[in-house]
């Protein structure tokens, strides 16, 4: 896509993400644990680059060495410990080390990633705090939830699994009290959102303050969900520049270094529906793109 962005977004993109070529990455997929341990031992004999370090398999297709995660900080040889704490940036450190490194004042990429991964409650709170357009949403705990929800939302409305759901599997259209009662039996807290009658939404992927891909997700007949995993159709036609500008605004304001944003236009206004830190790859495959190579290229420039 060759959409032009505002000068404000361009300046923000240029200033918010720097990835020097001399990158030392720290990562270990569980299925490669033994191999990575051998790599760690052998590299201790070499000079360790000190500018950047990473943990994530997101760069497994790059030429950058990915070493892996140890269960204990003390498991790292002292030379690797020194390289980590002196790094300019630590990439894809995983949920545990991400919080530890940030608490220690180290710079982590991607920011605001693991805490918001699959956490719709935290995402909604962030959008509301930053006054980002988001469908009216409320969280309900405790007793008498059905009565309180019915007093706040007219039927139909949307109910979601607040934590961990993906690919549309935890999204429900609540049409009547019986639907709501069934939802409440298995969900506490209840995540309730106003229903916007849409035939599509726009998935926009932003990495390192760069827009890397965007496509429409159009729902199949008889389903209110636009998710590709639920039968939605991908289209690259007529994507408005204003929608892309809005997505960039959301990513920059929320400090999301890697995110797949679901954007919609309703009643002449753009809304962010959800932030996906793990997002489907079908839209990339349809365009002949490799997300892992895209990320590797971002770090090599």
Residue spans of the language-model regions?
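Phosphate-binding site of ATP-dependent enzymes
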Residues: 171-251
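Conserved N-proximal alpha/beta basic substrate-recognition cap immediately N-terminal to
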Residues: 40-137
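Protein kinase-like catalytic core scaffold
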Residues: 157, 213, 271-274
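Short hydrophobic alpha-helical segments enriched in small aliphatic residues
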Residues: 8-10, 19, 30
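A short glycine-rich, hydrophobically flanked beta-strand micro-motif that places a catalytic Asp/Glu
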Residues: 256-267
């Amino acid at each position: 896509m060759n959409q032009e962005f505002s000068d404000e977004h361009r300046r923000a993109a240029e200033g918010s993400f720097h990835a020097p070529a001399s990158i030392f990455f720290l990562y270990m997929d569980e299925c490669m644990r033994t191999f990575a341990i051998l790599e760690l031992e052998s590299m201790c004999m070499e000079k360790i680059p000190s500018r950047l370090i990473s943990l994530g398999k997101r760069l497994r297709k790059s030429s950058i060495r990915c070493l892996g995660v140890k269960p204990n900080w003390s498991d790292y040889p002292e030379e690797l410990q020194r390289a980590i704490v002196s790094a300019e940036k630590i990439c894809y450190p995983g949920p545990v080390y991400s919080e530890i490194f940030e608490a220690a004042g180290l710079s982590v990429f991607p920011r605001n990633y693991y805490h918001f991964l699959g956490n719709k409650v935290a995402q909604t709170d962030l959008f509301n705090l930053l006054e980002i357009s988001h469908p009216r949403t409320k969280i309900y705990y405790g007793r008498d939830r059905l009565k309180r929800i019915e007093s706040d939302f007219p039927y139909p409305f949307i109910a979601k699994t607040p934590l961990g759901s993906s690919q549309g599997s935890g999204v429900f259209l609540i049409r009547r009290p019986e639907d709501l009662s069934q939802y409440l039996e298995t969900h506490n807290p209840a995540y309730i959102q106003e229903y916007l009658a849409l035939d599509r939404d726009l998935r926009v992927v932003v990495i390192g303050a760069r827009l890397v891909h965007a496509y429409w997700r159009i729902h199949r007949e008889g389903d209110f969900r636009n998710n590709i995993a639920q039968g939605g159709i991908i289209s690259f036609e007529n994507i408005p520049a204003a929608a892309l500008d809005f997505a960039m605004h959301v990513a920059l304001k929320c400090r999301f270094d890697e995110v797949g944003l679901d954007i919609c236009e309703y009643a002449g206004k753009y809304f962010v529906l959800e932030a996906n830190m793990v997002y489907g790859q079908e839209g990339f495959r349809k365009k002949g793109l490799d997300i892992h190579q895209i990320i590797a290229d971002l770090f090599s420039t």
